[in-house]
A protein has these predicted regions:
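A non-catalytic, amphipathic alpha-helix used as a structural packing/dimerization or gating element
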Residues: 14-29
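Glycine-rich flavin
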Residues: 32-126
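Intrinsic disorder at enzyme termini
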Residues: 1-18
Length: 126
């Protein structure tokens, strides 16, 4: 188990600590089965990871509430905690989540209304 004393740092709020515990519990329970066939079906494994992250509500952190997200606006601390935890469990899980944000972040911040309507809801859903 890695040192998680950083969760007590003052710029993290109780909601961040709860999120870290929630994603860690979820990752321990789900990631091993989700990545079991990664060498036989990499694309399918990534798709399955994103779907599972969506079903669990974690991809909702990659978009603001206006696009179906969990929070009013993107919260970098939440995104970092999710990525750190997923990466600790399996690099492919972090990759699958990160790719969602690489597209949705710029669209959330700078995309047209049409782009936001087209892309953000599907990302939030996983």
């Amino acid at each position: 188990m890695s040192d998680r004393s950083y969760l007590q740092w003052p710029f993290l709020e109780p909601a961040h600590r709860s999120l870290a515990a929630e994603i860690d519990t979820w990752a321990a329970a789900h990631i091993p089965a989700l990545v079991a066939r990664e060498h036989e079906d990499l694309d399918g494994t990534c798709i399955g990871l994103v779907r599972a992250l969506g079903e669990a509500g974690f991809t909702r952190y990659a978009v603001p509430a206006s696009g179906g997200g969990k929070l009013d606006k993107l919260d970098v601390r939440s995104l970092c905690l999710i990525r750190e935890t997923l990466g600790r469990h399996h690099a492919l899980a972090d990759f699958a989540f990160a790719i969602q944000g690489l597209g949705s972040g710029p669209i959330s911040l700078f995309g047209s209304q049409a782009q936001q309507q087209q892309f953000l809801q599907p990302v939030a859903a996983g």
